[in-house]
Amino acid sequence: AAVVMSGELADCFSTKSEGVAWITRTVREVFPEALFYGTDGRFHDSPVPALAAANWLASAAFLHERDPEGLLVDMGSTTTDIIPLASLSSLYGLTDLTRLQKGYLVYTGLLRTTIPAIVRSVSLGGLPTPVSAEQFSISADAHLVLGHIGEEDYSCDTPDRKGRDRTSCLRRLARVVCADLDEIGTGGALQVAQAFWDAQREVIHDAVARAMDESGASRIYTAGTGSMLLSSALGGTDLSVELGP
């Protein structure tokens, strides 16, 4: 088995090295011959620092063979990876910290991002309205009520441990502005959702534009759980359609 990992940063581990060692040991208990792909572009049979968060590089190395001048935008539940394939050789060895610093790791995703992580104020009835810095609602709520995902795609826990239906999502979105549906109605909650998506799309678009300008990439490919949404927003090729989920 060939393995990549991204769970070493979980707060149940004191350090990344501890997480890498635990994941490596646990996987090899089930698959004794497993090899682990690292950010150095090599396979390893023991825990080394390069194994931390190497999942993005495996996708990039695969796609680079198809189009070395492309840009891969991979949106997951929590983050969005922006990978300039033309610069692949310079990407080896990057950690999540350095990718954040370079703009290649954008910490916003299709499902788990809290609303105030992206948007600070929304317009309600034409009035600028600051949002509360609470975990009342997440990106999955916004994308569901906007029709970007269905209930079956809402695969993470809800902030209030309640339903994933449209009404439950609207209720959570209303709380973002310290209100409820009785106070701002469905229309107000939808304005919160739209403001979030507008801001999220802009953050990703700006990072993509910067990476394309720096790398000279000429084509965009999208992947991950948010691939269809991003291919429409960015005008890229949806790999989830072309290659399958």
Cite the ranges covered by each PLM segment.
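Helical "lid/coupling" subdomains associated with nucleotide-phosphate turnover
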Residues: 10-19, 26-38, 47-72, 81-245
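Active-site activation/catalytic loop segments of kinase-like enzymes and analogous catalytic loops
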Residues: 75
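Short, histidine-centered active-site or binding-site loop motifs used for metal coordination
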Residues: 5-9
